[in-house]
């Protein structure tokens, strides 16, 4: 995001439905500070999710999808405790502020760019409400016109399983059939009152594609001392790489659309120098605000040995162990999938909240090696806003998943 946009202050009346406010006062929102806070929350989520449900295993999830579904939930609940918890977790002072961030991301980051040669992006929201409950007319208007969400009144009391299957079909349809079952059996019951859902799909081509004829099977070293043979993409092209104390960072830009002047998407790989040091690197990254922005490779450099593995992983989890203060009869489910190959990246995530009753031109000449043959962290990020679309880690690229039963 350019400096003018980042420093622009948006009034609540420009970004949110006025029905959300109890007063007619226009609350000025510093979008730069609000976005900074939400990006810090996303980074905290990376650390929380990995430490709670993906220790030393493959994972992928979407912080952006979780933030979106929490925003919709907070804006449309009478449960003051739930709203207060979400706002505290998102480091936000009001639903007006979270809605303003949602509006900014929807109009800039999550706009589909495939027709002009950029990434294909789809970000959709859905709300399912128990039909016997009364609904504030302002909420329904907010769902449909502000959040652009599909909205349905359903019979949880007698047809909970049918609703669960409908939500799963909705998630599958909006993630290009990548996410088949966001809600596992038993997650929706006759006590369910609301389901808030968000589905995010991303498919981007590398700015410089890899030559498939150069891909070779090589060993990837596991933590247990063994290794697996997996296909590695190789290149002799200059790459955005920077070496730091104990680790290296690779930035792989995605091809931009012709009108993508306000956004830039990249994948980042964070590779520790030693194979057993990923946990320590993750701690450094997630405990230091501003770490990502201060560790971005700025120049393409000549490469020596350059190899990154192809991989496809799927990961699902229920977030009660992540939100350990979330004792509010609410469960949050997410499932995500990502595939990396010579052409680019395809990734998708679906998240649901289930609410139940009760609640310069210089560049160095020295060649740099980047051999991702041991565990590493990856992020997909929109660089101008700092938005984290997807995050994860690879411990064994030969495995499709090791945690699908956690959803």
From Swiss-Prot:
InterPro entries hit by this protein: Serpin_CS, Serpin_dom, Serpin_fam, Serpin_sf, Serpin_sf_1, Serpin_sf_2
Family of this protein: Belongs to the serpin family.
GO biological process, one term: DNA repair
Taxon lineage: Eukaryota, Viridiplantae, Streptophyta, Embryophyta, Tracheophyta
Note on domains (UniProt): The reactive center loop (RCL) extends out from the body of the protein and directs binding to the target protease. The protease cleaves the serpin at the reactive site within the RCL, establishing a covalent linkage between the carboxyl group of the serpin reactive site and the serine hydroxyl of the protease. The resulting inactive serpin-protease complex is highly stable.
The keyword Hydrolase appears for this protein: no
Domain of life: Eukaryota
Organism: Arabidopsis thaliana (Mouse-ear cress)
Molecular functions per Gene Ontology: serine-type endopeptidase inhibitor activity
Protein name, per record: Serpin-Z2
PROSITE patterns xrefs: SERPIN
């Amino acid at each position: 995001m350019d400096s003018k946009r980042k420093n622009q202050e948006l009034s609540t009346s420009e970004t949110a439905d006025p029905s959300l406010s109890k007063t007619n006062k226009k609350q000025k929102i510093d979008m730069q500070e609000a976005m900074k806070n939400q990006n810090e929350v996303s980074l905290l989520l990376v650390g929380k999710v990995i430490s709670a449900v993906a220790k030393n295993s493959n994972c992928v999830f979407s912080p952006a999808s979780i933030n979106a579904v929490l925003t919709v939930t907070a804006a449309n609940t009478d449960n003051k405790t739930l709203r207060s918890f979400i706002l505290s977790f998102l480091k936000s002072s009001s639903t007006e502020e979270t809605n303003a961030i949602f509006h900014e991301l929807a109009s800039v980051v999550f706009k589909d760019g495939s027709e002009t040669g950029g990434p294909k992006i789809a970000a959709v929201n859905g709300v399912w409400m128990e039909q016997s409950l009364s609904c504030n007319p302002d909420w329904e208007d907010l769902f449909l016109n502000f959040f652009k969400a599909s909205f349905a009144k359903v019979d949880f009391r007698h047809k909970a399983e049918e609703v669960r299957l409908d939500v799963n079909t909705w998630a599958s349809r909006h993630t290009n059939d990548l996410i088949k079952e966001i809600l596992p059996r038993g997650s929706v019951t006759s006590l369910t009152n609301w389901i808030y859902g968000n589905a995010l799909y991303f498919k981007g081509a590398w700015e410089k594609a890899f030559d498939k004829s150069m891909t070779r099977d090589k060993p990837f070293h596991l933590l247990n001392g063994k290794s697996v043979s997996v296909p590695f993409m190789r290149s002799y092209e200059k790459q955005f790489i920077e070496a730091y104390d104990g680790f290296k960072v690779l930035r792989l830009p995605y091809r931009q659309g012709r009108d993508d002047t306000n956004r830039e998407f990249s994948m980042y790989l964070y590779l520790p120098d030693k194979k057993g040091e990923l946990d320590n690197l993750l701690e450094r990254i997630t405990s230091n605000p501003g770490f990502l922005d201060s560790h971005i490779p700025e120049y393409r450099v000549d490469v020596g040995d350059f190899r990154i593995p192809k991989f496809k992983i799927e990961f699902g989890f229920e977030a009660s162990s992540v939100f350990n203060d979330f004792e509010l009869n609410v469960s949050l489910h997410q499932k995500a999938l990502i595939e990396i190959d010579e052409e680019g990246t395809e990734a998708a995530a679906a998240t649901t909240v289930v609410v139940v009753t009760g609640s310069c031109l210089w560049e160095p000449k020295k060649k740099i090696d980047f051999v991702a043959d041991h565990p590493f962290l990856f992020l997909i990020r929109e660089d101008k806003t700092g938005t984290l679309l997807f995050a994860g880690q690879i411990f064994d690229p030969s495995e499709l998943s090791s945690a699908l039963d956690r959803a």
